[in-house]
Amino acid sequence: MTRRLWVVPLMLLAACAGKGKNDVTVVPPGVPVEQIEMDPIKIAAVKGPDGTHLETYDVTELFERAGAELSAKHPAEAARDYDQLLKEFPDTRFTKAALYNGGLAYEGTKEWQTAIARFQRLAAEHADSSDAKDAQFQIGACYAEMGNWPTSATTFAQILERKDLNADDKIEAMGRRGFAQFQLKDLDTAERTFQSAIYYFNSIASEERLETDFYLGLVRYHLGEIPHERFRAVPLRLPEKQMGIDMEDKARLLLAAQRQYIETIKIGNPQWAAASGYQIGSLYEEFYDSFIHAPIPGELLGEANQEKREVYYEELRKRIRILLEKALRTHEQNLLMLERLGVQNEWRDKSKLAFAKLQRLLDPSYKFEFADPTTAGSETPVPPPPPAPTPPVERGGTPAQDKTPPSMRDPKDQGAPAPGPARQIL
């Protein structure tokens, strides 16, 4: 496919002037000859509003055009051009880059399976290149975007067997693998994976510096989400002795989750810090709600005991008011932190809404609605957890937009800014 042009010194070219078309020029021995490789050129007949015209282009022009479309966030056009390049120029120096960037373009159009096919071909045909490693990461991320969490977890387990991973690669792979396990509700396995990532980071922290703290933040945050999930699942049940045991379990899990969220804030990633601050406030508000919705003694049931029931709830609210006060202070501190850092994201908005709600609940003039007495003897209803941030599909370090159900992107009420443009191979 490559055309070769042989160039000799100008004096020889001049000597050839005037020769007939059938004359042969002989290059004397010892005269330097330069070989220039030129890209193959395509000529196509293109129909337009003004009729058919000829269009010429080479592989470099097509590659640059596709790259410009991808950078301009026109993924459909970029995918079309990369596909055209791979079809019309199947074996050039641009093939590997066109496969990778074409995969990124199909990620942009959310055609995950097609993106996976591009990355898989690159990984198979260029297994020894560093781009094959990046392609594997993209494959795992695409499976997560599809909600195929088992295959995503398996893909990142395979990546962790590679010998060419740096510290950032390992923590990202462990974080994404643990995230997939978390989405599968395999909390014990996810917890072990996240803990392995923390152990690894602590072992190299004095020798290596991470390029991004995003995935370390993801790991710590989800080490808080796991006890938070367990906290939500613990019911408050009668009789009184059982309720005391349940309360101790919930309090223990609350403190465990809070401890991990605080560790996440210490990492310093603004997005994960915002998510963690919000979740700490949510812990105390959820604990308060658990008490309010807990079953009540049988002697307080029935219309005849309505007055007694109202007194019971009034006293209960006085005793657990401190939980709302803690939640209010936490959201206030979170908002102050985010203002100081200049963070504007969905977590900030959620904390503002929660802060306003808690102010109303703590207002002495607020009129409470009494809990449904028919819940007596039943388990405490578990409020649905807010979405948490997800890892971005592109390799990088910014949480993705809030989406439900969570995809393979970064924390989740989850909510966070969209990731920046993916890295192209240039």
Identify what each model region corresponds to.
Residues 16-426:
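Acidic, polar-rich low-complexity tracts and alpha-helical solenoid repeat scaffolds
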Residues 1-14:
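Sec-dependent bacterial lipoprotein signal peptides
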